[in-house]
Amino acid sequence: MHTLLAFIFAILILVSLHEFGHYIVARLCGVKVVRFSVGFGKPFFTRKRGDTEWCLAPIPLGGYVKMVDTREGEVSEADLPYAFDKQHPAKRIAIVAAGPLTNLALAVLLYGLSFSFGVTELRPYVGTVEPDTIAARAGFQSGDKIQSVNGTPVADWGSAQTEIVLNLEAGKVAVGVQTASGAQTVRTIDAAGTPEAGKIAKNQGYIGLMPFKITTVAGGVEKGSPAEKAGLKPGDRLTAADGKPIASWQEWANLTRQSPGKKITLTYERAGQTHTADIRPDTVEQPDHTLIGRVGLRPQPDRAWDAQIRRSYRPSVVRAFGMGWEKTVSHSWTTLKFFGKLISGNASVSHISGPLTIADIAGQSAELGLQSYLEFLALVSISLGVLNLLPVPVLDGGHLVFYTAEWIRGKPLGERVQNIGLRFGLALMMLMMAVAFFNDVTRLLG
C-alpha cells in the first residue's frame, strides 16, 4: 500500500504539472481548453469551471489537455478564433513545448529543495572490490579513484556507476583511474553480451564495486537471527570460519550465502579474547528460486576511509537551486545520450523501466525519507520531460517537428506524411511500452 500511494502521488504531481504547463500556455495564447484530465479512461471525478472540464480518470499512466481543434470535430463559428489548429505555428510550438519544459523546471525546483536540506557527496573512490565479479575481473583495486568512463569525466560515485552501467552492454568500457599509489591507468571492463551484464542492465545493478571499505567487524546484529542466537554482538571481529582465516567480509558473506542450513564454526574476537560459536544460516529463497544462507550480521565500515570519501554540507538556498539546475542539466544529457545509444544499438533495452519498477522505486525512496523521494520525483520528471521532447510523432517532440516544418515551409506537412509519422510513432511507443512491461515482469520474477 505504501508503494502504491507513493507511486500514485508521484504520477499525480508529475502528470498534473506537465499537463498544466500545456494548459497555462494554451490559455495565454488564446486557445480554448475543453478538458484537462489526469489519467486515462472514463473519468470518476469531473468538475466544470469556466470553459474547461477538470477530470480524474482511473488509469494513472498519463493525462491530456483537450483543446478546441477543427481536426477533431465540428467547431462553432464563435470558437474558430480559439481553435488550436488555427493558431500561428509559433503559438502551437509554445503550447506543445510547455509540458516537457515544465517537467524540467520542476526537476530543478525538486533538486533545489532537496539540496537545501543538506548534501552528501561520495567521491569516486573504490573502497571494496567483491571477488569474482565484473569489476574484479577488470582488475579494479581498493583505493582506485575513478576519473573517467569511456572518456567522459566523472565527479562523484553516482555518475561513475551510471556511466559504467549504461555502457556495459555496448562493448568494452574503458575506466580511467588513478591508483592508490598515484599512477594513472585504465581498467577495461569487457562484459558485453554476458548474462551477468544483461542482469546488471535489467536491474540497474551492482558490478562488484563499493565506495566503502568494509572491515571484518560486526556493525549490527539482527534480532532473532542465527547470529544473535549464537551470541554475537556488534564490535565482534570475525577471524576464522571452520578453521580457515577470514580475510574480508566479502569472503564471510560468500560463505554464508553458499551454506543455507549448514553449520559453520565461527571464531571471533571480543575485548581481546577469542571465542567460537556454531552458526547455522537461515535458508532464504530468492526471487529466481535459488536458496541462499543468511545469518543476520551487518559489517562495520572503515570510519577513517568513510570520512575521506564522504563530504556532507548544507549549501545556501541560492547555491542549492544552482546545484538543482546543474543536476537537471546533467541528468537530461545522460538521458539523451541513453536514447541515442538505444537507437544506435549501443545500449540495452533492458534499461527501460515501466510503471511497476517505477512504483517499486517510488515506495523505496519514500521509505528512505523526504529528500530521497524528492530526488526520485526530480529524476522521473526529467525522464518524462526528455522523453516527450524526442522527435517522435505522438510525443510532444514529434508535434514540435511538424509545427516547426510548417513555420519554415509556410504550410503544413501533407496529411499523408503526418498520418504515416503518427502511425510510426504510435507503433514505436507501443513497442517501448511492451518492452518496459516485459522488463518489469522479468525483474519481479527475478
Swiss-Prot record:
<keyword id="KW-0862">Zinc</keyword>
<dbReference type="GO" id="GO:0046872">
    <property type="term" value="F:metal ion binding"/>
</dbReference>
<keyword id="KW-0482">Metalloprotease</keyword>
<dbReference type="GO" id="GO:0004222">
    <property type="term" value="F:metalloendopeptidase activity"/>
</dbReference>
<keyword id="KW-0378">Hydrolase</keyword>
<keyword id="KW-1133">Transmembrane helix</keyword>
<feature type="active site">
    <location>
        <position position="19"/>
    </location>
</feature>
<keyword id="KW-0997">Cell inner membrane</keyword>
<feature type="transmembrane region" description="Helical">
    <location>
        <begin position="376"/>
        <end position="398"/>
    </location>
</feature>
<dbReference type="InterPro" id="IPR001478">
    <property type="entry name" value="PDZ"/>
</dbReference>
<dbReference type="Pfam" id="PF02163">
    <property type="entry name" value="Peptidase_M50"/>
</dbReference>
<dbReference type="GO" id="GO:0006508">
    <property type="term" value="P:proteolysis"/>
</dbReference>
<feature type="binding site">
    <location>
        <position position="18"/>
    </location>
    <ligand>
        <name>Zn(2+)</name>
    </ligand>
</feature>
<dbReference type="Pfam" id="PF17820">
    <property type="entry name" value="PDZ_6"/>
</dbReference>
<protein>
    <recommendedName>
        <fullName>Putative zinc metalloprotease NMA0084</fullName>
        <ecNumber>3.4.24.-</ecNumber>
    </recommendedName>
</protein>
<dbReference type="InterPro" id="IPR041489">
    <property type="entry name" value="PDZ_6"/>
</dbReference>
<keyword id="KW-0472">Membrane</keyword>
<keyword id="KW-0645">Protease</keyword>
<dbReference type="InterPro" id="IPR036034">
    <property type="entry name" value="PDZ_sf"/>
</dbReference>
<feature type="domain" description="PDZ">
    <location>
        <begin position="100"/>
        <end position="181"/>
    </location>
</feature>
<feature type="binding site">
    <location>
        <position position="22"/>
    </location>
    <ligand>
        <name>Zn(2+)</name>
    </ligand>
</feature>
<feature type="transmembrane region" description="Helical">
    <location>
        <begin position="419"/>
        <end position="438"/>
    </location>
</feature>
<keyword id="KW-1003">Cell membrane</keyword>
<dbReference type="InterPro" id="IPR008915">
    <property type="entry name" value="Peptidase_M50"/>
</dbReference>
<feature type="transmembrane region" description="Helical">
    <location>
        <begin position="93"/>
        <end position="115"/>
    </location>
</feature>
<comment type="similarity">
    <text>Belongs to the peptidase M50B family.</text>
</comment>
<keyword id="KW-0812">Transmembrane</keyword>
<dbReference type="InterPro" id="IPR004387">
    <property type="entry name" value="Pept_M50_Zn"/>
</dbReference>
<keyword id="KW-0479">Metal-binding</keyword>
<dbReference type="GO" id="GO:0005886">
    <property type="term" value="C:plasma membrane"/>
</dbReference>
